[in-house]
């Protein structure tokens, strides 16, 4: 009985995707002193003033030139930068490891806002594939629609699309929250490991396929469930959290979260290599 309880503790996942995994001799948990919060900066980041605002027209710039200019403006202390005429350029706004208010007046191409940590971004248009890939922290809001692989491998922060998104949204995500106001395509949450996905509309086939952990909330119809994705009880705590999150995201006003479906990992794939051949067939 004691061994059973010990095993349960080692595999227990907290609610809403906050997973705690006990590993021999080490832990994935990190502890920081609040008094030292302002000491954690990346090399090459800048102190900026959010009240110091400027416009940047990138119509005749390449993506590399535009990104270098954004960095230069931050070095001058600008904390709010409005990008004019992005015109669907790929890889705009990537690699920003700084606190910053960034506003795009238009649409972005592929890989916009990838590998960022800290900025607050509003895109008044659409985005292509892999928007905000590897986001570490901050907030990215898309006013219209997004392409496939939206929020791939994000580790933190809030990623919000007020329209619909393509396939493989949240693929391999390891934390953070993705919120979709419309519909999502096939394989949403594929190989998801941590974090939460909220979709107010419908979702395509193979939802949560091969997900290891995390939580997916769906407000509409589900095309089909992927391997090891199962329904779970929507608790009062879940509903309260959803209401708060949607309110802060300024999306889904008056949406009835009590009717949402909650999908989690069935955990059959956790020890896949140790299963018998007949059990492996049932797991996938």
Predicted regions and their residues:
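Acidic, glycine-rich active-site loops and adjacent beta-strand->loop/helix elements
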Residues: 146, 165, 184
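Glycine- and acidic-residue-rich phosphate-binding/metal-coordinating active-site segment common to enzymes
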Residues: 167, 173-183, 194
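Beta-strand repeat architectures
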Residues: 69-80, 91-100, 111-119, 130-136, ...
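Feature marks extracellular polysaccharide-active and adherence modules
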Residues: 84-86, 95, 105-107, 114-115, ...
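Intrinsically disordered, low-complexity terminal regions
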Residues: 1-92, 193-200, 204-284
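Extracellular/lumenal glycan-associated surfaces
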Residues: 99-107, 119-120, 138, 157-158, ...
């Amino acid at each position: 009985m004691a061994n059973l309880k010990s095993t349960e503790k080692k595999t227990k996942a907290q609610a809403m995707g906050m997973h705690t995994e006990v590993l021999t001799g080490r832990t994935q948990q990190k502890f920081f002193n609040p008094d030292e919060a302002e000491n954690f900066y990346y090399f090459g980041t800048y102190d900026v003033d959010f009240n110091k605002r400027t416009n940047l027209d990138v119509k005749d710039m390449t993506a590399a030139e535009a990104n270098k200019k954004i960095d230069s403006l931050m070095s001058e202390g600008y904390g709010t930068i409005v990008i004019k005429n992005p015109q669907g350029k790929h890889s705009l706004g990537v690699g920003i490891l700084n606190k910053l208010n960034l506003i795009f007046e238009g649409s972005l191409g592929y890989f916009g806002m990838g590998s960022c940590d800290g900025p607050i971004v509003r895109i008044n248009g659409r985005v292509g594939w892999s928007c905000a890939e590897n986001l570490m922290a901050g907030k990215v809001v898309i006013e219209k629609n997004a392409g496939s692989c939206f929020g791939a491998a994000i580790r933190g922060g809030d990623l919000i699309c007020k329209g619909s998104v393509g396939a493989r949204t949240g693929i391999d995500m390891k934390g953070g929250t993705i919120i979709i106001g419309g519909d999502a395509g096939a394989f949403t949450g594929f190989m998801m490991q941590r974090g939460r996905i909220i979709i107010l509309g419908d979702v395509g086939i193979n939802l949560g396929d091969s997900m290891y952990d995390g939580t997916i909330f769906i407000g509409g119809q589900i095309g089909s469930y992927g391997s090891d994705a199962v329904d779970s009880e929507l608790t009062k705590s879940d509903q309260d959290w959803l209401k708060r999150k949607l309110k802060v995201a300024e999306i889904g006003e008056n949406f009835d979260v009590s009717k949402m479906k909650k999908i989690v990992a069935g955990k059959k794939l956790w020890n896949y290599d140790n299963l018998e051949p007949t059990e492996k067939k049932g797991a996938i």
